[in-house]
């Protein structure tokens, strides 16, 4: 028995004689009362592998039949808000330790293992199969094991150093597992994460198994190997003598990955700059560089030559059948990949594949999964790829954001805005008293938060942070369907993806129905994109539909409506070019017209009357100001429970609608007046306060 640093438990029973069958078992041990054992072992004399899984579940499996006949389990009932996803706790050092450990008993055919770090997934979790790159160890997901293990049954393919199974044989290894998984969990997707060479393997498998529900995640796929910058150097590698081979993997390591990015993984961004630099220096000199010299043991000379041959055959095989791929595909491409032209390949695959999305990481190298970036699970969530049946359900399949995701979003996504606007929150109690904080907002759902959409939706980030930190509530906000469009073959993982990580959903009546039915806190802006992209002179003006759109649905579920107002957009920027101004510029006119025409396919507000029906999408011209402050006021909650007349009587519902609208307008007027009394409205005053009050956790504001 050998236990490695990545908590992999290996139970080998290897007979290395060529005329005897080889057996190999790997077990994932899970703490807690309910344990699962996954046995993956060869069953054919030719060394191919099939999967046999036995799962003990005290509640019983509640498989979804794809037609909605059974009540689906809700992921957020099993995973708490701000859970620990473990990303950053393991680094490339752990990868090398795990790789060395698994190579100690490295005989036999290709096999599968389930890392113990993955733990116990949520109920009805789909399967994720990791197909490794050139190293073949299967340890390329080490930094992601804990996070992925919450959402998937994870199995990783290990190809022993001395194994010489051809590409077609590896296809059979994967297909045997797919067939067994399809028989065990017939109504669930199967995820194939293919790293580099594994990307060729995943595409080839998908082309040969078009009837299966597969989701491919291709990380710098080696389908572009024939166009690699290294092609002129490959003949030289074959002539390097054995005694000098140790230099080859060492040199390749600097081409395949970014050592600085690898060393940065796991260093806390909250640390002072000097401390971070010192930690990075120590990791580079004491950990990274010594570890790179060990690559020769992972990829010996004969193995390297075999892997290059395997890469050529895999690249040719996958490209010859790429037209047959029907699977859902997500390509992750690094901008600094020195081994493959990954960004160019991502564009090519986006054009060839029928259902392909792309996310580019411009600062990463070839070994993206081992470098400092974003958790793979975060990328899957942000691109809307996580589902547990044949289609995504925004309620039951939603994975709450983790502690690490919140920290990254606050520091790297909101960043300057969050610190500059110094947001202040007020709410109204049932007796009408206005208090600081969010105490007046009900804790139990369903709750419908209805308010004013500030310029470009700048109020969303600080508001989401306040609800999470003060009330431990994640509200679900609506997003324009254009954010779910993946037509850009060079798209980065950006703000639009992050709002999906934090619960945004496409704006449809059906989705609002589902969320209220699940007793969620739901954020609604009746003014939509038209209000967020308003013209000059329209700040703080409600551009709402003439007739109510939400009161009757709220009443159907007995939801509490909380109207709110926000102010502060005019304190951070001056709107100088609005839609009317931009349409007078010929080049911009053509661009905005084309974008607006493309968005009409979403058919938003087709039946609405008035100005709100006009929702052109554009970027307004802004001149920044010395930042002021954002203010939020949540009005007195309006109960709809026990008022069945609101469901049946449109006039009664419209009266409540007008009441909500008036309350939002009153909140805005109140904040505009009271902010004049705030001695710390300017960022300069708040900065001075923070410097003179080092123990203060929050800069004060006006008294309500």
Swiss-Prot record:
A Pfam family this chain is assigned to: DAGAT
Keywords, ordered alphabetically: Acyltransferase, Chloroplast, Plastid, Stress response, Transferase, Transit peptide
Keyword Chloroplast among record annotations: yes
UniProt main location, coarse: plastid
GO molecular function: diacylglycerol O-acyltransferase activity
Tissue specificity annotation: Mostly expressed in flowers (e.g. sepals, petals and stamen).
Null allele phenotype: Plants lacking both PES1 and PES2 grow normally but show reduced phytyl ester and triacylglycerol accumulation.
Secreted listed as a keyword: no
Cellular component GO terms held in the UniProt record: chloroplast; plastoglobule
Catalyzed reactions: a 1,2-diacyl-3-O-(beta-D-galactosyl)-sn-glycerol + a 1,2-diacylglycerol = an acyl-3-O-(beta-D-galactosyl)-sn-glycerol + a triacylglycerol; a 1,2-diacylglycerol + a fatty acyl-CoA = a triacylglycerol + CoA; a fatty acyl-[ACP] + a 1,2-diacylglycerol = a triacylglycerol + holo-[ACP]; phytol + a fatty acyl-CoA = a fatty acid phytyl ester + CoA
SUPFAM superfamilies: alpha/beta-Hydrolases (SSF53474)
Subcellular location: Plastid, Chloroplast, Plastoglobule
Induction: Accumulates upon nitrogen deprivation. Triggered by NAC072/RD26 during senescence.
Targeting signal (transit peptide) range: 1-27
Subunit structure: Interacts with PGM48.
Name of the protein in question: Phytyl ester synthase 1, chloroplastic
């Amino acid at each position: 028995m050998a236990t490695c640093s990545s908590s992999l438990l290996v139970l080998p029973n290897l007979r290395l004689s060529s005329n005897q069958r080889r057996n190999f078992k790997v077990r994932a041990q899970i703490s807690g009362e309910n344990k699962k054992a996954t046995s993956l072992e060869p069953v054919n004399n030719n060394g191919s592998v099939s999967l046999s899984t036995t799962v003990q579940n005290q509640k019983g499996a509640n498989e979804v039949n794809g037609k909605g006949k059974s009540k689906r389990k809700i992921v957020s009932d099993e995973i708490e808000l701000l859970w620990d996803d473990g990303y950053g706790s393991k680094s490339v050092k752990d990868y090398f330790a795990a790789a060395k450990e698994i190579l100690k008993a490295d005989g036999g055919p290709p096999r599968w293992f389930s890392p113990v770090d993955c733990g116990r997934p949520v109920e009805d979790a789909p399967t994720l199969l990791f197909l490794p790159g050139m190293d073949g160890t299967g340890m390329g997901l080490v930094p992601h094991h804990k996070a992925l293990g919450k959402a998937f049954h994870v199995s990783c393919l290990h190809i022993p150093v001395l194994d010489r199974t051809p590409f077609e044989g590896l296809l059979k290894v994967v297909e045997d597992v797919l067939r067994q998984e399809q028989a065990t969990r017939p109504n669930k997707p199967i995820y194939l994460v293919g790293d580099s060479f594994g990307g060729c393997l995943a595409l080839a498998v998908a082309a040969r198994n078009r009837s299966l529900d597969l989701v491919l995640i291709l990380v710098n796929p080696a389908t572009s190997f024939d166009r690699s910058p290294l092609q002129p150097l490959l003949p030289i590698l074959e002539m390097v003598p054995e005694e000098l081979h140790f230099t080859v993997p060492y040199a390749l390591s600097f081409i395949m990955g970014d050592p600085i990015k690898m060393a940065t993984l796991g260093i806390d961004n909250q640390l002072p700059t000097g401390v971070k630099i010192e930690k990075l220096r120590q990791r580079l000199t004491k950990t990274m560089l010594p570890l790179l010299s060990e690559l020769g043991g992972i990829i010996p000379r004969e193995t390297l030559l075999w892997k290059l041959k395997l890469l050529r055959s895999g690249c040719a095989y996958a490209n010859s059948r790429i037209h047959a791929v029907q699977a859902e595909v997500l390509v992750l491409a690094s901008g600094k990949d020195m081994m493959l032209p990954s960004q160019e390949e991502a564009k090519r695959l986006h054009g060839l594949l029928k259902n392909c999305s792309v996310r580019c990481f411009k600062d990463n190298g070839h070994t993206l999964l081992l470098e400092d970036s974003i958790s793979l699970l975060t990328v899957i969530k942000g691109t809307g790829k996580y589902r547990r049946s044949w289609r995504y359900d925004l309620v039951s399949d939603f994975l709450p954001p983790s502690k690490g995701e919140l920290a990254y979003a606050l520091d790297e996504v909101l960043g300057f805005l969050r610190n500059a606007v110094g947001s202040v929150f007020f709410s109204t109690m049932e007796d009408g008293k206005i208090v600081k904080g969010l105490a007046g907002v009900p804790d139990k759902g369903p709750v419908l938060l209805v308010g004013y959409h500030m310029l470009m939706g700048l109020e969303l980030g600080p508001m989401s942070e306040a609800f999470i930190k003060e009330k431990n509530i994640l509200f679900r906000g609506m997003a324009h369907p254009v954010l779910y469009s993946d037509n850009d073959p060079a798209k980065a993982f950006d703000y639009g993806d992050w709002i999906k990580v934090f619960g945004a959903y496409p704006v449809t009546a059906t989705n609002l129905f589902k969320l209220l039915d699940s007793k969620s806190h739901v954020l609604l802006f009746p003014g939509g994109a038209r209000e967020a992209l308003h013209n000059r002179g329209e700040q703080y003006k409600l551009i709402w539909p003439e007739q109510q759109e939400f009161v009757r649905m709220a009443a159907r579920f007995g939801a509490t409506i909380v109207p709110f107002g926000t102010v502060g957009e005019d304190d951070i920027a001056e709107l100088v070019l609005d839609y009317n101004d931009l349409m007078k510029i010929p080049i911009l006119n053509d661009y905005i017209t084309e974008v607006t025409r493309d968005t009409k396919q979403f058919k938003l507000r087709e039946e609405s009357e008035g100005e709100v029906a006009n929702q052109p999408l554009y970027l307004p011209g802004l001149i920044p100001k010395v930042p002021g402050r954002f203010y939020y006021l949540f009005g007195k909650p309006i109960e709809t429970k026990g008022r069945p007349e609101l469901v049946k009587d449109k006039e009664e519902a419209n009266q409540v609608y007008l009441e909500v609208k008036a309350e939002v307008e009153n909140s805005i007027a109140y904040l505009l007046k009271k902010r004049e009394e705030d001695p710390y409205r300017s960022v300069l005053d708040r900065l001075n306060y923070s410097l003179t009050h080092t123990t203060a956790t929050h800069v004060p504001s006006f008294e309500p």
